[in-house]
């Protein structure tokens, strides 16, 4: 994507959040200004999600922005950041799907504390794209809806996310249609980048894969 530098060029992505948002949203302002429901917005585009591991345990969504493809960046307590691979995300989502089936996911239980990395991904905007195959077992659950907002690092981060996805949708989506690459996530069944194949196991320490699609534009 021409407006988004490759992730390897960033020293600290979080500090460049505003720049990323401007680049991703520099679109035609002559489109319809009518806001669309977030459920429709999520189906039309991907998301760049920056998740921060908390020193006391658990994870929080630091920032997230609309993107043509869905990517997850993990920031550890020391400030080091890396992109999760397709295999890592597929493995996390497979584990979370099993927990949801068993009724043990903190996303579907009231008062859940210290969400796992997989649960945090599913609570982000990326969750509706990457975890669409989980369906109503998660996204129509009232406990999930209550947990989602608390997963963000701050109320301001939540509001920025909501506003950026609404703004991007109204600026880029043609009336009544969805466009090329941005429509792919709605049909995703399990793969990180919209692959319909079954999630595969992956080494937890891997940060890149020769068979994975390119992350950058």
Curated annotation (Swiss-Prot):
Subcellular location, principal: membrane
Keywords per UniProt: Cell membrane, Lipoprotein, Membrane, Palmitate, Signal
A GO CC term attached to the entry: plasma membrane
Membrane topology: Lipid-anchor
Disordered: annotated span: 150-217
Biased composition (Low complexity): 167-217
Subcellular location: Cell membrane
Lipid anchor positions (S-diacylglycerol cysteine): 27
Stretches assigned to coiled coil: none
Compositional bias (Polar residues): 150-166
InterPro entries assigned: UPF0323
Lipid tethering residues (N-palmitoyl cysteine): 27
Signal peptide stretch: 1-26
NCBIfam families per the UniProt record, alphabetical: PRK04081.1
Protein family membership: Belongs to the UPF0323 family.
HAMAP family: UPF0323
Protein name: UPF0323 lipoprotein WS0575
Species the sequence originates in: Wolinella succinogenes (strain ATCC 29543 / DSM 1740 / CCUG 13145 / JCM 31913 / LMG 7466 / NCTC 11488 / FDC 602W)
